C-alpha cells in the first residue's frame, strides 16, 4: 500500500518489463475501485483488487502506450470495467503491437475506450472524485489524474525527469508547456505518482528537475 489517508487507499503495483507503475484507488465508502494504467500482469492486478474486497469500476489510462495498456483487454473482459482514454491518443493505441507482444508477458491489444477523457472532467466512485487534466506532449492525449493532494502524472512528469517526446505524437515544447501551466501551478506539497520510477512532489521538481530550471 502506497498511501492511506482521508479514506482513500492507493496501492501501487510495479509490472514488467519496463517497469511500469499500476495504481489501484479505493475508498472505505465503496466496494468499487479504479485502476490506473494497467500495463501488464492482469491476473496479478485482479488478485490485488480481490484482496482489497473491491470490484473494478473504471480503468483510466494516462495515455495510450502499450506499456500502460497491455492488461486492459483482459481486465475489461473479466471484470466488465469501463475503459477510458483521451480521444487524441486513439491514433497511438496499440501502435507497435508486434514488438510489444515479444516484450510484455501476455500482451493483448487494448479495446476501444468505453468513454473518452476530457479536460476538467470529474470521475466519481463512492466519495472519491478524480479530476482529469489534459497534459499533451509525451503523447497528444496524455492526461494526469488529480485526487485531493495526489497527482498521477503518467509519463508527463517523473522524479527529476520528464517524459520522452521523441516517440510518434510527442512534442517537447508542448510537454514543457503542459508541465509548467498545468502541474507546476499545483500546491508545492502535492505528491506526484508517476508512470515509472519513484514518487516525488511538485516542490521537489520545481527545485531539482533539470528540465524545469530555466
Residue map of PLM features:
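Metallo-beta-lactamase
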Residues: 98-102, 129-214
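Residue-level detector of beta-strand face positions
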Residues: 12, 24, 116, 122-124, ...
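Conserved S/T- and glycine-rich ATP-binding loop of Class I adenylate-forming
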Residues: 25, 62, 135
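Small/polar loops that bind or transfer phosphate-bearing groups
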Residues: 36-37, 85, 127, 194
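Residue-level marker for buried hydrophobic side chains located in beta-strands
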Residues: 34, 58-60, 83, 152, ...
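Active-site HxH/HxHxD metal-binding segment of metal-dependent hydrolases
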Residues: 40-124, 207-211
Amino acid at each position: 500500500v502506497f498511501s492511506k489517508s482521508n479514506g482513500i487507499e492507493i496501492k501501487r503495483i510495479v509490472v514488467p518489463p519496463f517497469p511500469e507503475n499500476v495504481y489501484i484507488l479505493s475508498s472505505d465508502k465503496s466496494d468499487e475501485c479504479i485502476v490506473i494504467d494497467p500495463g501488464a500482469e492482469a491476473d496479478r492486478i485482479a488478485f490485488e483488487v480481490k484482496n482489497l474486497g473491491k470490484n473494478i469500476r473504471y480503468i483510466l489510462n494516462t495515455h495510450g502506450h502499450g506499456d500502460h495498456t497491455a492488461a486492459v483487454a483482459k481486465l475489461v473482459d473479466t471484470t466488465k470495467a469501463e475503459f477510458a482514454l483521451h480521444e487524441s491518443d486513439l491514433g497511438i493505441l496499440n501502435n507497435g503491437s508486434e514488438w510489444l507482444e515479444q516484450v510484455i508477458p501476455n500482451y493483448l491489444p487494448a479495446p476501444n475506450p468505453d468513454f473518452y477523457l476530457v479536460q476538467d472532467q470529474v470521475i466519481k466512485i463512492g466519495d472519491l472524485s478524480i479530476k482529469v487534466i489534459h497534459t499533451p506532449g509525451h503523447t497528444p492525449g496524455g492526461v494526469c489524474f488529480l485526487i485531493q493532494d495526489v497527482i498521477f502524472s503518467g509519463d508527463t512528469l517523473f522524479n527529476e525527469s520528464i517524459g520522452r517526446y521523441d516517440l510518434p505524437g510527442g512534442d517537447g515544447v508542448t510537454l514543457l508547456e503542459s508541465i509548467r501551466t498545468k502541474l507546476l501551478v499545483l500546491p508545492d506539497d502535492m505528491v506526484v505518482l508517476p508512470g515509472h520510477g519513484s514518487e516525488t512532489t511538485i516542490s521537489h521538481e520545481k527545485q531539482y528537475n533539470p528540465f524545469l530550471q530555466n
